[in-house]
């Protein structure tokens, strides 16, 4: 019986596709197929509470389940799916994912996080696996330990602290270029204006100094990667290996990108070895040559750090700029704080108890990089809000439900109010704030990301005052306004910059 169930799971996507090809000619036919498949999936993946009540959740959707909804429409779906209760189930293709929304369930799930496994390719299918499936953030067990041990030293708190002067210089140069190329007052699209800073700041940390030609090549590789992610986000048959034969042009683009991306890293490695540099790429690629890391583990992890996190870093930084522009009293207080610490700026940026640090934290709270966390599973059975979830079942955290939880954050949880952190014990944030992940698999780049955000904001405010353009409705400054073309909520707002007659430092 177990063998039959396993076989059914293996062939299920193919059966669904073949049946759908014959029947999917109307909305009624689609509804019938989705309803039947939902019932079958529920039977194959039973989850009940102590009274025998089955877990609820949205109906399976053709081929993709709720995968695209999670990535592209997460904030809206968070609201829509509230009706299913504090714990519910969605589908990634035909793979079940249990969604948890309460801090107590987050704690219950993560208590054994050191034994958790990330879902294969984030349950996103074949094409996603070709791009990122072997990256550090999506592998588990001894492989994860091996890859993380290679990249962790370069992103540890001590290592990042030593890079403070370089990050500050990069931020200053970026802002200076922005200032020189514009008039005394101008308006920019926030995400577009800041995107290249975190990208090239991270690239410099990985590779050391790059020539202008190399920087242009790297940016172009990033754009090609984003194009491939566009195919991932279109879903459908890109979820399955059959896409290799159905979409030859896209697959050729994929193969060309992967070849060029590996070639770029190998060339930079040889160049840096030749001049005696000891940048992270030298150590990482040496492990590839020695056979300690596979080529896929290396280039997928580098893709994760640079390309996948480009949208994440751009989103975080652009929302920080927007919130400062929309909350001018807070901006004024930050400006005063920077002026007071103008003789110890590196020490100031390293602190976690400043208003600037709280602005970064509040931005990450209000705008987590994704509405639903990367799926992971515990080998142990879990009881989540009364439902018994079998071991090795994918679980995701509804990050907005945690970060906007009125029981912890108060009635004005949706308001940008960084001073709220003055009175909150940081230990209390452990299961009440989702920023860079939770448990032992917390994002490796958290220290670097926070440092980039602080230095960029500091240098930007040194040269400019920020405002929401007067023709824009300020009442909409904190409403949903994001791009739908990326897998994280990139801001789609404008900010007005006014040059200061005199800098703060």
UniProtKB/Swiss-Prot annotation:
Molecular function per GO: heme binding; iron ion binding; monooxygenase activity; oxidoreductase activity, acting on paired donors, with incorporation or reduction of molecular oxygen
Residues with glycosylation annotation: 316, 392
Keywords: Glycoprotein, Heme, Iron, Metal-binding, Monooxygenase, Oxidoreductase, Signal
Residues annotated to bind heme: 443
Keyword hit for Oxidoreductase: yes
Induction: Expression is positively regulated by the thioclapurine cluster-specific transcription factor tcpZ.
SUPFAM superfamilies named in the record: Cytochrome P450
Family the entry assigns: Belongs to the cytochrome P450 family.
Protein name: Cytochrome P450 monooxygenase tcpC
Encoding gene, per UniProt annotation: tcpC
